[in-house]
From Swiss-Prot:
Species of origin: Mycobacterium tuberculosis (strain ATCC 25618 / H37Rv)
Keyword Hydrolase in annotation: yes
Keyword hit for Nuclease: yes
Induction description: Induced by hypoxia and by DNA damaging agent mitomycin C. Part of the Rv1954A-higB1-higA1-Rv1957 operon, as well as the higB1-higA1-Rv1957 operon, which is probably the mitomycin-induced operon; the former but not latter operon is autorepressed by HigA1. Induced in persister cells in response to D-cycloserine.
Source domain of life: Bacteria
Gene Ontology molecular function terms on file: RNA endonuclease activity
Gene assigned in the entry: higB1
Name of the protein: Probable endoribonuclease HigB1
Length: 125
């Protein structure tokens, strides 16, 4: 997958179930260890400018992407999709198995549908 064009990048958006709701993603993200959060934030920033190392991002299903970070045997993930020029973070979690858990993928797909119902298929111009 080619890196995104930095000139076309927007800003990170965080999943929330309604226009005025608190971002659910942030609650999940806050549960991760400090070091994992810091590393994932750096990766998220690097994604915006197209400066990710090989293996830091992986397509999961449909247009859901996985941002990946690990230290030793501890693996952390952010699942997201592109909403126009903006990446939308859907869920964050610790991964303790070989494959990304199907429940996390289903959560991301469900949240993507909810986001698009609440905010539209593309952001307003």
């Amino acid at each position: 997958m080619p890196p995104p064009d930095p000139a076309a990048m927007g800003t990170w958006k965080f999943f929330r179930a309604s226009v005025d709701g608190r971002p659910v993603f942030k609650k999940e993200f806050d549960k991760l260890p400090d070091q994992a959060r810091a590393a994932l934030i750096v990766l998220m920033q690097r994604y915006l400018v197209g400066d990710l190392a090989a293996g830091s991002i992986k397509p999961i299903r449909g247009d859901i992407l996985e941002l990946r970070w690990h230290e030793a045997n501890n693996h952390f993930r952010v699942l997201f999709f592109r909403w126009g020029q903006h990446p939308v973070a859907l869920t964050a979690f610790y991964k303790n198995q070989q494959k990304t858990p199907k429940t996390k993928i289903e959560t991301a797909l469900d949240r993507q549908k909810i986001w698009k119902r609440a905010f539209g298929d593309t952001p307003p111009i």
